[in-house]
């Protein structure tokens, strides 16, 4: 669809519920994700205690030229329902909207 301001290029299948997207210093996309949307919905409605968290990195080089990599995946016991992943130096800061803290993860 074209509205004069934006042209559609492509969809990128990620196999997870992508939430907020951030960029690193070289242009990779980072996102906090919900790998199980049914568990996330139940968690958001207060029907489950935890929901899994996932962080993905997308190296986008152009149309049909990208890689999607899971860099963090856990069952929600460390942090439920990650909604953002912000790279900073060799760290990733991850947060969600339900907790009053965020994670600091170190990349190796």
Each language-model region and where it sits:
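Blade-level signature of beta-propeller repeat domains, shared across WD40, Kelch, NHL, RCC1
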Residues: 76-108
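Short loop/turn segments immediately following beta-strands, especially the blade-tip
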Residues: 1-4, 57-64, 106-108
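Short N-terminal helix-initiation segments at or just after the protein's N-terminus
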Residues: 1-7, 30-34
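Structural signature of WD-repeat beta-propeller blades
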Residues: 10, 19, 80-83
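Loop/turn-rich, solvent-exposed surfaces of beta-rich toroidal or solenoidal domains
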Residues: 14-73
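A structural motif specific to WD40 beta-propellers
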Residues: 7-9, 69
């Amino acid at each position: 669809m074209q509205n004069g301001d934006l042209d559609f290029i492509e969809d990128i299948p990620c196999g997870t519920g992508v939430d907020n997207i951030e960029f690193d210093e070289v242009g990779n996309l980072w996102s906090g994700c919900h790998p199980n949307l049914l568990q996330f919905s139940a968690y958001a409605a207060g029907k489950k205690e935890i929901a899994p968290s996932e962080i993905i990195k997308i190296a986008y080089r152009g149309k049909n030229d990208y890689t999607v990599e899971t860099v963090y995946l856990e069952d929600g016991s460390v942090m439920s329902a990650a909604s953002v992943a912000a790279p900073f130096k060799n760290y990733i800061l991850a947060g969600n909207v339900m907790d009053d803290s965020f994670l600091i993860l170190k990349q190796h």
